[in-house]
């Protein structure tokens, strides 16, 4: 097999690959064995048609596509390895020659990983985040816990206020017609949560239980349902019930409800302080690591291919969908409640996606420049930690992980950032 790599402008190039005729014939043989299983010709049992009869009846060309499906993946992978390139996208393949008894010639236009010209990455000046825990921090955490332990109590009299939960029926109309997803009964809506279309919740304020009202709103221009985007809508709303939050008293009993390891409110405050101190310390360390990485990435010169940004945006979208599903939601519901569509969300994610790609390429280049590698001992230590965290035997964890490349890459990533932090100038 012969391989030629021609670099084009930017991060693109063309592989020209020639596969030996002998290998092509092997591919045709394999293709025939696959295809003939489903062939029935009078005088022969299904799957037992001789090759010569098959080719006479259908032509050898009938085998070409299946032969290509067999030959191309292996030939392309070998060509990439021989050329020493790192494609970042699916290649665009064109067949130049495919004929029985002759070599296979194809071209593959590919986008490759860009060259990284590192700027300054040692001696970077960064500030360490203040990790002091104040009395106010402790009080704020106490208030948050108080909110979490609040009870929703029905208001016997009174009107809807911000922070209340209103149990409502609603039905929406656009141009006088009801629309899909615009109707619900006994829906619990927290006023001020921003869950509904802008202006909807505000107009519930002041309503009483049993009261009915028509609410006028306008769907956002970027609303996910194009047929509703930018259109005025009328919602008929009925309030069934109003619930208000009743906060528990901040006393020793509350402290024991929150944490059965404490007896008094003061003990709870001490425990909160220690937890916040640990949290702030970790946040400060994470912020420091992020800062050195961000500066090193900013100093690097990289012509990032658009396809890498798109692929990272795809990954971010999948991660976001997974987080929504953990909350019992999905992307479709998110689009409905937020007024966004996929295109708007992708555009919103694009800048972060590009930063992620830039950082990953920079870290990889620094690791290479500084010969940062991961030892077997380090991998085994990491596996021990992971096994302990998941309450598994190391061998079982290895079996579940299969390939340990991900563990190795994660360790190399962390070691490279450790190197950047150790070689930075940290100001308090």
From Swiss-Prot:
The keyword DNA-binding does not apply. Transmembrane segments: none annotated. Keywords: Cell cycle, Cell division, Chaperone, Cytoplasm, Isomerase, Rotamase. It comes from the Bacteria. Its EC number is 5.2.1.8. Consists of 3 domains; the N-terminus binds the ribosome, the middle domain has PPIase activity, while the C-terminus has intrinsic chaperone activity on its own. Involved in protein export. Acts as a chaperone by maintaining the newly synthesized protein in an open conformation. Functions as a peptidyl-prolyl cis-trans isomerase. This is Trigger factor.
